[in-house]
Amino acid sequence: MVLNTKIVLACVVFTLCMACQNTTKLPDPLQAGWQNQAVCEVVENNPKIRVLKCTFPPGVGHDKHYHASHFGYTIQGSTFKITDTTGTRVVEVPTGTEFYNDGIDWHQVQNVGDSTAIFLIVEPK
């Protein structure tokens, strides 16, 4: 009886642990796209870095995705609606803006401006 109780308890703990895990794997920025259309392309991929060029015409965005650690540079800016763990906000992203991030759990963006935005994203490996 003690053995059966231990097995049942172990099964319950295992089930609870599995239920607490995030079962939804989000795409990275290259995989994400917008409404099943690619918005990023690989411009360099080597053993040390991956560089993406992401282009967002007005009205186009980036479906919910995550980012690993990365550096970004804004080749051409615009205005974006950004939704993430802190809520939704509208942000002006000027041309020439650079940024670094240790990683983003998830976000979704949409170009709500009137000009096409272009970013370079550099991801160390």
Question: Where in this protein do the model-derived segments appear?
Answer:
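Bacterial N-terminal signal peptides that target proteins for export
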Residues: 1-9
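C-terminal motif of bacterial Sec signal peptides marking the signal peptidase cleavage site
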Residues: 16-19
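Short acidic-glycine-tyrosine-enriched beta hairpin
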Residues: 86-104
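A short glycine-rich, His/Asp/Glu-containing loop-to-beta-strand
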Residues: 33-61, 68, 72, 122
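Glycine- and acidic-residue-biased ligand/ion/polar-headgroup-sensing regions
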Residues: 67-86
